[in-house]
């Protein structure tokens, strides 16, 4: 595989233990620079609409970085300034699923991406 033109985009599952909410994310993706990726986060075992869903990422050797979040009942997302214009976070209340789409991918976007409640 030509790693000059591709990089790994990984997502990982997170579990909300206190509220017994489980968040299950879509799998790992390999994308080319300049493309976009959309990952999902399906909630089960609790109320989806009333609580914020955040997206964070962790690049190799780095700490956690908050990208943005959404409260599904309101439908309006907030984004970290760093990602403004490149990230779109949405939620589908009917399927209890949140989505994060990141566009104009760069090599420095290689990271593990988490959804969290």
Swiss-Prot record:
Residues 78-115 are annotated as: Framework-3. SUPFAM superfamilies: Immunoglobulin. Residues 20-44 are annotated as: Framework-1. It is found in: Secreted; Cell membrane. Residues 116-117 are annotated as: Complementarity-determining-3. V region of the variable domain of immunoglobulin heavy chains that participates in the antigen recognition. Immunoglobulins, also known as antibodies, are membrane-bound or secreted glycoproteins produced by B lymphocytes. In the recognition phase of humoral immunity, the membrane-bound immunoglobulins serve as receptors which, upon binding of a specific antigen, trigger the clonal expansion and differentiation of B lymphocytes into immunoglobulins-secreting plasma cells. This is Immunoglobulin heavy variable 1-69. It comes from Homo sapiens (Human).
């Amino acid at each position: 595989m030509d790693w000059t033109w591709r990089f790994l985009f990984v997502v990982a599952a997170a579990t909300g233990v206190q509220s017994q909410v489980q968040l299950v994310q879509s799998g790992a993706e390999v994308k080319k620079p300049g493309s976009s990726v959309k990952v999902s986060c399906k909630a089960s075992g609790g109320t989806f609409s009333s609580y914020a869903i955040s997206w964070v990422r962790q690049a190799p050797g780095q700490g956690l970085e908050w990208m943005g979040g959404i409260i599904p009942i309101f439908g309006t997302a907030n984004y970290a300034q760093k990602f403004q214009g490149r990230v779109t976070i949405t939620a589908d209340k009917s399927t209890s699923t949140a989505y994060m789409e990141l566009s104009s991918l760069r090599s420095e976007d290689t990271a593990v991406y988490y959804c969290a409640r």
